[in-house]
Amino acid sequence: MSGYIKELRKQIGHQTIIQCAASIICMDEDKRVLLGLRSDNHCWGYSGGSIEIDEKVEDCAKRELYEEMGLIAQELELFYINSGIETHYIYPNGDEVCNVEIIYLCKKWQGEPQNSDGEMEELRFFDLKEINLDQISPPIRPVVRKLMDEANSL
């Protein structure tokens, strides 16, 4: 949880917030995507997190990728902006959010995937055809669905 969100939660508890987030989906040359098994809800997801005060969206996405997966993004391409009712989510700890998420696609990065900060239990590349949407973290299912639908053009 980001510093800004942590401080906000101290004041408002679990009350619903609009959470602005930035994320990166890493895709290798075989069009496999890197996902991590989240330690909070035990679902698969890509790297991402809340934007800090005065932080640029791209900088947040890159920071989250490095913190969660140990990778340094070299090139980013805007993929999608995820928002709406499907992003409304209650975390296992009771925090309620309505996400506005800016997602980038990254095909060039530096480093080897590693579980850096403990937010992920496992990291793994998935062929898009083998992904079971029921095992994807609920607020990002629309993004993964779109990724699967557009795989041939990426």
Residue ranges of each PLM-predicted region?
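Acidic, metal-coordinating catalytic segment for phosphate/diphosphate chemistry
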Residues: 1-23
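Conserved Nudix-box catalytic region and its N-terminal flanking loop in Nudix hydrolases
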Residues: 28-68
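Conserved hydrophobic "DFG−1" position in protein kinase catalytic cores
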Residues: 26-27, 35, 106, 125
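NUDIX/MutT-family hydrolases
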Residues: 103-107, 114-144
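Short connector loops at helix/strand junctions that flank enzyme active sites
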Residues: 19, 39-41, 46, 73, ...
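A generic structural micro-feature
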Residues: 14-18, 92-100, 117-120
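Active-site-adjacent beta-strand/loop module that shapes the phosphate/pyrophosphate-binding cleft
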Residues: 82-112
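A short coil-to-beta-strand element that immediately follows conserved catalytic motifs
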Residues: 72-82
